[in-house]
């Protein structure tokens, strides 16, 4: 399933936003949106581009001298790249989902199809990732080549031994492709590119108004928490299939980052909520709430704290390990994210006079 969020049909006036007591809105939503673009969104994508460049370098080093040490280094950079990309989930709109760029299926379509990756490696034609299946060209495909299917020391030795010829050519192509897509995210949001940040702040282009822009930003916070709960934790945990575990339906099972990515998604929500990223404080959705119903803010803060505590209690376990060895802990994460989703979708939405619409990933 692609890591998708809002489709273009939702980005107009697919939601209703009211004003305070029928009067003028006492909060400058355009200033909030402009701040989020410059303080949170663009810096996150710039960091993603930087990490993607480091991943390209690390895999080139790995292919130039395959060893357990260079493999471990490439894996570390892969994890760092996934971490920062996961922290962009709360603004997975516009160029992420919409044509002509529609970057999401090019970067993080999951789960990976190992058989399709192997077909590409076995092929004799030139590598054309634009024409390759989404399930064989994204970050999960890189994870497959770096981690294999089974893990363990024997698998690591086999991975190192196989890193030559077309396999390395494909790995290099994948990481170069991801660096190009990361740069494309930056260009799409930048004033010297598509200026999607400007469209968002000014309520133009894709957006019908500043009201619509602000509503879309808030909706994405709700959708992200719902997707973490339902798709990234709940589905593998058997919450959507009558108790049947769906361990293969993880975002990054092979790289062991499914839990970490889900937690990073929540941190992404919190970054937009607070308007803060990398120690730079801007204006966030929390400020909008403080202008309308400040008494509710501590409840939201407590909900975020509960989610972080539940994730932290699982330590460094993979989702497979946690489900097998600490299902109560996984349940605690699921419930904490559900509580956060509820306070956002019900209490905060009511306070902001925003009607949350249909989540386009619901039912996937």
What is each model feature region?
Residues 1-9:
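Bacterial N-terminal signal peptides that target proteins for export
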Residues 16-19:
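C-terminal motif of bacterial Sec signal peptides marking the signal peptidase cleavage site
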Residues 21-23:
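Ser/Thr-rich, Pro/Gly/Ala-heavy low-complexity intrinsically disordered linkers and tails
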Residues 25-364:
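Mature extracytoplasmic or organellar-lumen-exposed domains after removal of signal/transit peptides
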């Amino acid at each position: 399933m692609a890591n998708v969020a809002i489709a273009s049909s939702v980005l107009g006036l697919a939601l209703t936003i009211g004003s305070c007591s029928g009067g003028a809105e006492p909060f400058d939503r355009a200033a909030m949106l402009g701040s989020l673009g410059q303080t949170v969104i663009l810096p996150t994508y710039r960091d993603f581009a930087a990490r993607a460049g480091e991943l390209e370098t690390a895999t080139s080093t790995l292919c130039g001298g395959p060893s357990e040490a260079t493999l471990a280094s490439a894996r570390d950079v892969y994890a760092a790249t996934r971490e920062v990309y996961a922290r962009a989930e709360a603004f997975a709109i516009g160029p992420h989902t919409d044509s002509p760029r529609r970057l999401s299926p090019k970067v993080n379509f999951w789960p990976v199809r190992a058989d399709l990756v192997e077909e590409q490696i076995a092929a004799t034609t030139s590598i054309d990732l634009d024409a390759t299946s989404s399930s064989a060209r994204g970050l999960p495909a890189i994870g497959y080549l770096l981690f294999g299917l089974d893990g363990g020391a024997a698998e690591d030795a086999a991975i190192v031994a196989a890193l030559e010829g077309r396999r390395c050519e494909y790995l290099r192509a994948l990481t170069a492709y991801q660096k190009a897509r990361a740069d494309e995210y930056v260009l799409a949001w930048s004033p010297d590119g598509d200026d999607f940040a400007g469209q968002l702040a000014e309520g133009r282009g894709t957006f019908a108004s500043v009201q619509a822009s602000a509503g879309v930003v808030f909706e994405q916070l709700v959708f992200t928490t719902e997707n973490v709960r339902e798709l990234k934790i709940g589905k593998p945990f058997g919450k959507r299939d009558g108790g049947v575990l769906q361990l293969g339906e993880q975002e990054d099972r092979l790289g062991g980052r499914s839990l970490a990515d889900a937690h990073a998604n929540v941190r992404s929500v919190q970054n937009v909520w607070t308007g803060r990223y990398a120690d730079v404080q801007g204006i966030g959705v929390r400020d909008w709430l403080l202008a309308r119903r400040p008494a509710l803010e501590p409840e939201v803060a407590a909900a975020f704290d509960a989610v972080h505590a539940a994730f932290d209690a699982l330590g460094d376990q993979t989702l497979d390990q946690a489900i097998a060895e600490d299902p109560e802990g996984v349940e605690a994460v699921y419930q904490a994210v559900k509580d956060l989703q509820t306070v956002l979708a019900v209490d905060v939405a009511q306070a902001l006079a925003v009607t949350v619409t249909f989540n386009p990933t619901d039912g996937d």
